A protein has these predicted regions:
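A conserved beta-strand element that flanks and buttresses the S-adenosyl-L-methionine
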Residues: 55
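A short glycine-rich, Lys/Arg-flanked "PGG" loop and its adjoining helix->strand segment in the class I
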Residues: 69-81
Length: 144
């Protein structure tokens, strides 16, 4: 996001960590950044905006699949016409791929995280696209 900011993009953001918000604000002094838990949704100032793009990187795997659906539907409503949500995270196309990665990871697998499985979100979001960029991560996109 700092690169986008450097190119003149207006940046808005939310993180549950006050410290992360503080560090980001130091790098992007004109950005509108807020502290808040995604499980409670976006803070009011962010809900009042409309966006060309919404980016989420390695943050939404803390939500259950049901919470992801609710949260993403809320984000879709905040997009401008032809806006897009881009999510970079630990993600898989299928449950089989996730289970294979979990087996390979063994004890280092984080059981507390709820990683994205694109095929399982597709019924809620027929427009969902998934592009893998490693064996255990990818970009999910939703366009309005």
């Amino acid at each position: 996001t700092a690169r986008l900011y450097a190119q003149g993009c207006c940046m808005y953001g939310q993180d549950f960590s006050e410290r992360m918000v503080q560090l980001a604000q130091e790098k992007m002094p004109d950005a509108k950044l807020y502290s808040g838990d995604f499980k409670q949704g976006l803070v009011e100032p962010l809900r009042a905006q409309r966006y060309d793009f919404i980016l989420a990187t390695y943050s939404l795997h803390h939500l259950t699949d049901a919470e992801k659906v609710l949260f993403l539907n809320g984000l879709l409503a905040l997009l401008k016409e032809d806006g897009e949500i881009l999510i970079g995270d630990v993600a898989f196309r299928t449950r089989v791929e996730l289970e294979a990665c979990k087996t390979q990871a063994g004890a280092s697998w984080d059981e507390d995280e709820i990683y994205f499985v694109a095929d399982e979100l597709a019924p809620a979001f027929p427009q969902l696209k998934f592009v893998p960029f490693s064996a255990c991560a990818g970009i999910l996109s939703l366009r309005r």
